[in-house]
Amino acid sequence: MAEAVLENVNVPAVVSKDECIYCFESPYNEPLALNASPKHSLNICLNCFQATCNRHVPLHIRVTEYACDTIHSNYLTIAKVEKPKQENVEENNNNKKIKLQVIETSEDDTHNTIWSLQRFNGENVPRTVLSKSTDSDISSTALEKIEKILKAKSQDFEDKKNSWVLEISTCPHTENFQIPSKPENTVNLNQCSSCDLTQNLWLCLHCGNIGCGREQIGIDGHSHALDHYRSNNNHPLAIKLGSLSSSTYDLYCYACDDETRFPDNVNLGSALQIYGINIQEKIADEKTLVQLQVEQNENWQFRMVDSSGKEFEKLSASKNYGCGLINLGNSCYLNSVIQSLVNGGVPNWSLDFLGSKFPLDVVYPDNNLKCQWIKLLNAMKCEPELYPNGIKPTTFKKCIGQNHQEFSSNRQQDAMEFLTFLLDLLDKKFFSSSSSGIPNPNDLVRFMMEDRLQCNICGKVKYSYEPTEAIQIPLEENDEPQDMLERIKAYFEGQTIEFKCANCKEKVTANKKPGFKSLPQTLILNPIRIRLQNWIPVKTSNELSLPGLIDRDDMLDVSSYLSQGFDPQTENLLPDEDENRSSFTPNQCSISQLIEMGFTQNASVRALFNTGNQDAESAMNWLFQHMDDPDLNDPFVPPPNVPKKDKREVDEVSLTSMLSMGLNPNLCRKALILNNGDVNRSVEWVFNNMDDDGTFPEPEVPNEEQQQKKDLGYSTAKPYALTAVICHKGNSVHSGHYVVFIRKLVADKWKWVLYNDEKLVAADSIEDMKKNGYIYFYTRC
């Protein structure tokens, strides 16, 4: 019977066998008592090779009965049982180990695998066990097929391999590298040529100079390798001697100011031999740049003890607190944002309309956004008690980030940028204009922002309005403690700018002043903690004092910033001559990122305008192509409006380029429309959406109400209470560590609950929220 079931099974190279596709059940068990049965197991479908727990096998069968030609009823059930640990000094070491790579080793060393081949006959019907691991009469053919499934790489393993590995590419200097002539004198590989350091040594591949590197995390360095490049700017490539091995090395290009690699190791090996180094015989004996970066990120720890050194009270996963989210390597930014939304940082934010039941027409839920939200919310809100050690949001992260270059990577990201990305994604997927009456929870944080522009010569004014999700508050450029209320006041006082007045017909100065046209249910404040030091963007840790950190009843009052709008009794509007100018509001998160990279405000706005206000990366690429433009850093004025093209028109050259790759014409056209004509992103979209039919729904004719901007927020003011704070430690928002504090009732008392990845504790200290607060959530009372 087993042979007949397995005969036509084709085993893929990678099998999803780490957790259930509908929940977070895994096959892993602690050591078992004698004759005890494992508590946890997964059933690998022999048709689609997806894993389901015992609870959800009937659901998968119903789904395949509804959506597939055949019912998926045959499964390989596996359970992994941990072997009793042997005493080992390293295992007993309490110091936290940093896992830099996932070494491809068998689980046979740590776990015993129990398996059985089973046929499920329907709900409430006993399953048929066709064969099991203890059987002695199973044929070699069937056993070979089962072993192939068990030995196949797991999807989790494939993801982990890249968790801490930097994505390093070649550069023009490695691609065009010419092997140098052998130096006349023997190179001393044991000491810096400019000082007495014997570690952190870098070899110039062009001449053999040995220079020490930069000082890094407790490692001495005087940057003599960099000094050598500055004196010899045609010598950009240097390799770290202590990192050399047959499989890895640290190579830095000073011209590109980035890590790099050779297209292959042939040129590298030949160059090293010139200096008497055989890379095949080398064993790395110093930390690599990857290790140093990971160690630095891991060192950004948040206090888990109070001021007296006592550990914070640990909280168990429950419906009140939810459950923890395990860090996937660099996913703490995602964990903090999700906890903020789901666990009360934005009160009443909910996706309850999705329900808790999975749709029957989705066979592969890992790639379906609705299914991933249902899976996540079921664990965090409906049954968190099942996951006392937290859950891994692996498939959730992959699903939401699959079409975004940054959020699909394993690099650390800016939590504020991710929050806005997530809200936009939910809008597009669940709350588009065609949605019928579903309240959008994202509107809880939205409001209308007013910009009042008054000419300092003629005194006439212009008002403009824009829907907004957060306010980014500039801080003073110092290291002193600052009062957030003073910074908010300074922000709403506005600034003096230059502009061409439509009434005065000349370039003049004007006062540009923001104000609230309406107020949100939850107000998000994002202090700008980035400033330039010696043209290098540095994240600050100014201590901020603000309402609500200590006393819940200490409210934020923003009523004085609620604008009354245009007053015809005391104000005169500017003429409408400037209406031929397009209204453009740049994405503030992208502006902050570009400024962090060292670009000016004017250049950043200009770049975002010319790239469709898409994202910082597109704008950055545009800036690199226009660095020589004489007006790049001049104040930016949007050009006059031109008749808009049909949004469904595409550039024929771009379309032809994609069609030459053999791609479906309808998909190509749709991809170019969705990606604003970007060919690279469009090609990626096509490959990620091969099951799309390439058609657009018929455009709706908007009625008068729909043509008006949706009313957002409240027209009257009320006090705001602080409900959550996302904190960040690190030198940049793209490194370090994120956590979130959410105010909750703990034993009938309001306390701050710290969500630090999978750890949940009641925290009494507010120091981290003062010095490291990055996103503050204030909710209307």
Swiss-Prot record:
Residues that hold Zn(2+) 3 according to the record: 204, 207, 228, 235
Active site location: 332, 737
Stored InterPro entries: Papain-like_cys_pep_sf, Peptidase_C19, Peptidase_C19_UCH, UBA, UBA-like_sf, UBA2_scUBP14-like, Ubiquitinyl_hydrolase, UBP13_Znf-UBP_var
Keywords for the protein's UniProt record, in alphabetical order: Cytoplasm, Hydrolase, Metal-binding, Nucleus, Protease, Repeat, Thiol protease, Ubl conjugation pathway, Zinc, Zinc-finger
GO cellular component: cytoplasm; cytosol; nucleus
Annotated CDD domains: Peptidase_C19B, UBA2_scUBP14_like
Protein name: Ubiquitin carboxyl-terminal hydrolase 14
Gene from which this protein is expressed: UBP14
